[in-house]
Amino acid sequence: MKVIFQQDVKGKGKKGEVKNVSEGYARNYLIPNGLAVEATSANMKNLNAKKKSEEKKKEEELQEAKAYQTELEALTLELKAKSGEGGRLFGAISTKQIAEALSREGKKVDKRKILLNDPIRSLGYTNVPIKIHPEVTATVKVHVVEE
């Protein structure tokens, strides 16, 4: 019997997949528990419509992320920090401080999305990558100046 999985079922199939399973398994377990529905033509049309709307939604999210990327890349953040000789900072500029500076500019970014390997420990310009979307990464210029 062909069924369309409504949820992931370990070892059998993932959500949205169409598979052949034994009739007893489908009628006695999958369908009553809401894990799958019978693959009728109406259900197949619904599945295709859902897939199309999901693809469209993903495409819109990608376009929004690319637009946000250009906005972020146009920015140059200026952060002030106390420094000693040779431009070395007392302390460091962390992702939290960069996220706060971005929010002051009106750009909301989660600090966990800022891909800074090590905190910034010197004066000057640093390019900081920010992951906006799984496929889109923006690079923001951070200018650290002496306080």
UniProtKB/Swiss-Prot annotation:
It comes from the Bacteria. One of its GO terms (molecular function) is rRNA binding. InterPro entries: Ribosomal_bL9, Ribosomal_bL9/RNase_H1_N, Ribosomal_bL9_bac/chp, Ribosomal_bL9_C, Ribosomal_bL9_C_sf, Ribosomal_bL9_N, Ribosomal_bL9_N_sf. PROSITE patterns: RIBOSOMAL_L9. Pfam families: Ribosomal_L9_C, Ribosomal_L9_N. Keywords: Ribonucleoprotein, Ribosomal protein, RNA-binding, rRNA-binding. One of its GO terms (cellular component) is ribosome. Belongs to the bacterial ribosomal protein bL9 family. Binds to the 23S rRNA. This is Large ribosomal subunit protein bL9. It comes from Halalkalibacterium halodurans (strain ATCC BAA-125 / DSM 18197 / FERM 7344 / JCM 9153 / C-125) (Bacillus halodurans).
